[in-house]
Amino acid sequence: MSPQTETKAGVGFKAGVKDYRLTYYTPDYETKDTDILAAFRMTPQPGVPAEEAGNAVAAESSTGTWTTVWTDGLTNLDRYKGRCYDIDPVPGEENQYIAYVAYPLDLFEEGSVTNMFTSIVGNVFGFKALRALRLEDLRIPPAYTKTFQGPPHGIQVERDKLNKYGRPLLGCTIKPKLGLSAKNYGRAVYECLRGGLDFTKDDENVNSQPFMRWRDRFLFVAEAIYKSQAETGEIKGHYLNATAGTCEEMLKRAACARELGVPIVMHDYLTGGFTANTSLAFYCRDNGLLLHIHRAMHAVIDRQKNHGIHFRVLAKALRMSGGDHIHAGTVVGKLEGDRQVTLGFVDLLRDDYIEKDRSRGIYFTQDWVSLPGVFPVASGGIHVWHMPALTEIFGDDSVLQFGGGTLGHPWGNAPGAVANRVSLEACVQARNEGRDLAREGNEIIREACKWSPELSAACEIWKEIKFEFDIIDTL
């Protein structure tokens, strides 16, 4: 045999195609504490056995290719290959299976969400043997978690910076999202903040357009923040969107926010990309800025039940890449969100140790080994009548982000903010007194209306507004 086709062990190379299961199916494998574990929902093509499909996923997302190659003999495949160690049928679904795959830690670059996703959700999602494939969950081992900085500051540090405790934080997205001049935009911010909100927000698609360049917006918003702080005696903030066409421009905008002395900036982490997001998170920690994350484009990736990536995986990835807030649905508003599923990934964002719980879609126990937590942001079609449910569902460590539910108040932005703040304070007080928000919520809001004309007007205008549609992404 010629040297070109001889392996390290001196055994001849046998060309050809062999079943993936001969190499990648290891049902007796005991997972290691250092393995990254993945749960994939597979829909094989007709005639493709589930075992072969699961092994193809393990192979194509790690060391495998479609045919045997002679360079396999130049490394130790048993050390580096992904292993499909279990396959379970999905109850109630025809021809759907959950394939569990273990990846050795050495396959991944330290501190790189980009590299992790390039491997695990790369070419395998276009594999012809699969009709559909969805990544349902990942177990990130402590050994890998410790290579990430994570959120720039986290929940407790943010509360200390703001000096605000014992309640959810309140925010508002400025509307109309596009078309306002910088000066009028700053005026809208000021009215909301002086009315009682903690934060206002750039919409995700506000960057630097002809009608409002970013630097002008930053200056007028900073003026609004300082003026509202002087009037209310509270620390205020506005999520200045630093998302840009290049990383250099993004960091320049963040640096301007720092120089203006404002507390927080914002990034669209999926459209901006994980490399850019991680770079911004490092900058924010080094320079004392909080980082708000918007998930624009997430539904393209996560909404279909049988294909894509579940949001709980995107949420874990954000906690690793870095962000102090992230939008997480509302359960009760206009955007998709099953209650149990939402509470599952909310815990994955906030808590340090989360037990496996399939009833909430959590496939693996996750230990974050003290990586800072992330505030979930409830946003999308919410108003004062939703406040009891939002307070009960999300608890104190959350941001309740209104938009039309503040700016649509018949008396203007500041009264809309007053209505939001009064309804929140009423719900928190009622909860602290032992009242049941889920059962008594409407009564609590009506009682608060008696001493707040702003809240009464808000309740009247939105009393018939509901968003009742079937949830697409269920367990």
Curated annotation (Swiss-Prot):
Pfam families: RuBisCO_large, RuBisCO_large_N. Mg(2+) binds at K201, D203, E204. Substrate binds at N123, T173, K177, R295, H327, S379. Binds 1 Mg(2+) ion per subunit. The modification N6-carboxylysine is found at K201. Transmembrane segments: none annotated. The keyword Transport does not apply. The modification N-acetylproline is found at P3. Its EC number is 4.1.1.39. It catalyses: 2 (2R)-3-phosphoglycerate + 2 H(+) = D-ribulose 1,5-bisphosphate + CO2 + H2O; D-ribulose 1,5-bisphosphate + O2 = 2-phosphoglycolate + (2R)-3-phosphoglycerate + 2 H(+). The disulfide bond which can form in the large chain dimeric partners within the hexadecamer appears to be associated with oxidative stress and protein turnover. One of its GO terms (biological process) is photorespiration. Residues 1-2 form a propeptide. It is found in: Plastid, Chloroplast. Heterohexadecamer of 8 large chains and 8 small chains; disulfide-linked. The disulfide link is formed within the large subunit homodimers. RuBisCO catalyzes two reactions: the carboxylation of D-ribulose 1,5-bisphosphate, the primary event in carbon dioxide fixation, as well as the oxidative fragmentation of the pentose substrate in the photorespiration process. Both reactions occur simultaneously and in competition at the same active site. Belongs to the RuBisCO large chain family. Type I subfamily. NCBIfam families: PRK04208.1 (NF003252). This is Ribulose bisphosphate carboxylase large chain. It comes from Marchantia polymorpha.
